[in-house]
């Protein structure tokens, strides 16, 4: 199955995102922002046991999901940035927490045509392709339609380094 592939290592180096989106219901949509947030929370967030970001949110917009990951309820979020300030690792970037939410539908159903985000990314950080999850190459599946290349943080990595 083809997936939207995002190379966060390339994407995060870009100084000014020029990616366009063709999301039908909202032409001013910035779908890549929601994809980057989703991928970052799933692969880079440290998922702290105490989770200061969750405790700092006055609107209960963040919570720990049953799988241990931190989840943001976008309709509760007022973009106050308290989670960003509280994150001890600086993982929650303030520009990832917009008040107005954008959506990505991964352009499901656009067969034979590349999504506008892929064709408009000047750094080639996005692609649609058949790809296998490969932990040794830092390629992770996030959800059903997204594959991400990034350095994933894990508690196991830190325990190995301490020894």
For each feature predicted by the language model, list its residue ranges.
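Short glycine/acidic-rich loop motifs that flank beta-strands on beta-rich extracellular proteins
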Residues: 66-68
């Amino acid at each position: 199955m083809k997936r939207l592939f995002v190379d966060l290592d390339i994407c995060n180096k870009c100084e000014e995102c020029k990616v366009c989106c063709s999301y039908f219901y909202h032409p001013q949509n910035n779908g890549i922002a929601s994809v980057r947030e989703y991928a970052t929370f799933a692969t880079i967030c440290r998922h702290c046991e105490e989770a200061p970001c969750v405790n700092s949110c006055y609107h209960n917009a963040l919570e720990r999901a049953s799988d241990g990951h931190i989840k943001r309820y976008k309709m509760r979020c007022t973009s106050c940035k308290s989670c960003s300030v509280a994150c001890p690792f600086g993982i929650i970037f303030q520009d990832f927490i917009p008040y107005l939410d954008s959506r990505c539908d991964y352009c499901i159903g656009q067969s034979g045509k590349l999504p506008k985000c892929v064709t408009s990314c000047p750094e080639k950080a996005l692609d649609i392709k058949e790809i296998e999850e490969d932990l040794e190459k830092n390629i992770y599946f996030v959800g059903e339609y997204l594959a991400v290349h990034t350095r994933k943080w894990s508690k196991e990595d830190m325990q190995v380094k301490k020894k």
